[in-house]
Amino acid sequence: MATLGRNVTITLIGHGTFHLTTPEGRNILIDAWVDGNPVCPEPWKARVRENLAAIFVTHGHFDHIADLVDLARETGATVVCQYDMVPYLEGEGIPAAQLVGFNKGGTVTVADVRATMTTAHHSSTIYENGQIINLGTAAGYVLRFSNGFTVYHTGDTCVTMDMQIIGELYRPDLVILPIGDHFTMDPRQAAYALKLIGAKYAIPEHYGTFPILTGTPEALIEHCREFGVTTEVIALKPGESVS
């Protein structure tokens, strides 16, 4: 398995939830599906709550925000999200001072990380009390750490030419992207996305949790060969880390 060597630790909690530790030792979460996540290792259900500084939210589907409100209340972590999700979270009892809402193209600094919100082509709704609630639009993030290491989390999305622009503008070292198919891009689309982005490393996510998510890291690697992509694919199992 690759060693990043950049003093940033990235752990797959399961499905689309990731835990990152910054060079300063700050802990951040990308999406928050923990307690009911069928592939989350039991020790991580407590560990994600330890010294949690921030939670970055890509969109409002249950498999990305099921534990968001509880974690924010318990830990006091700053919640970073697309602007139109803020009123819903305030209504759930998260103080305005704990919320950082912004939009595509904007950049904020939270927990020593400069985060730029990017486009993701996906929906962002939840179903509560017999109603569909719109929680803004889906997003991705470019996360730039204090030592220059840069991670691009695409969010749930299909492949898009925006990824080429992001690759040219931000030169991400590592990409986190979905490969499961059905609700997001499949391994072949993801391989083409990696061709557009040009990062050194990639971590696949959002596959295998349910039978309908049929994409595999092996298929991603195969299609990377098809497109001449040299990005190294790091296939983490839930609970595994790379640093």
Curated annotation (Swiss-Prot):
Gene3D superfamilies: Ribonuclease Z/Hydroxyacylglutathione hydrolase-like
InterPro entries xref list: Metallo-B-lactamas, RibonucZ/Hydroxyglut_hydro, UPF0173, UPF0173_UPF0282_UlaG_hydrolase
GO molecular function: hydrolase activity
UniProt cross-references to SUPFAM superfamilies, sorted A to Z: Metallo-hydrolase/oxidoreductase
Protein keywords: Hydrolase
Pfam family, one: Lactamase_B_2
Family: Belongs to the UPF0173 family.
HAMAP family the record matches: UPF0173
UniProt xrefs under NCBIfam families: PRK00685.1
Protein name, as recorded: UPF0173 metal-dependent hydrolase Caur_2542
Organism: Chloroflexus aurantiacus (strain ATCC 29366 / DSM 635 / J-10-fl)
UniProt lineage: Bacteria, Bacillati, Chloroflexota, Chloroflexia, Chloroflexales
